[in-house]
Amino acid sequence: MTVPGPFTMSQQAQNDFYKTDAECALDYAAAVNEEIRDLFAAGADVVQVDEPYMQARPEKAREYGLTALNRALEGITGTTAVHICFGYAAIIHARPSGYSFLPELAGCRCNQISIETAQSKLDCAVLEKLRGKQIMVGCIDLDDQTIETPEVVAERIRKALRYLRPEDVILAPDCGMKYLPREVADGKLRSMVAAAKLLRAEYAGRR
């Protein structure tokens, strides 16, 4: 289950009430915290907080975004993830080769961090700074309708496995699969599942 993050909502909102945007973000965080608690009470197994604006506005994210995010996760005992991305692939085609805000999430209360690596060809060395977190590695390029082979997907994951333990890696698509034709999306997901099976066999016993 996903919920919008407090920092991202504060960046999209018009603030006519709070003295500072930081105050606004913290009140959003309190509301998100209640929502997360309700979702777990209703039976959710994982709740993901989407924070794309941390990549878009890293200075403000450092100033008060991480504080707001941690407030949203305060006291939560269920498994939580934070998603940070470059925007939908169908809309934003040019991707930077690295995140402007990512190592900072080592200080986040979440259990998992969801990132994109396929379209951006991310240098996965940055993941070494996130040890202790499970990483959802975006490994499906959603700007290209070509269906990757399982081996292509597996090789993208191997780049992350240079810096992470196998048990800390979760395979996922990059951001924005909803724009793909259903048959293309289905084919890409099947390749991702096949890549996961391939990698499990390859890394069995390496923990």
Task: Describe the role of every protein-language-model region.
Residues M1-R207:
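Domain-level signal for soluble alpha/beta catalytic cores
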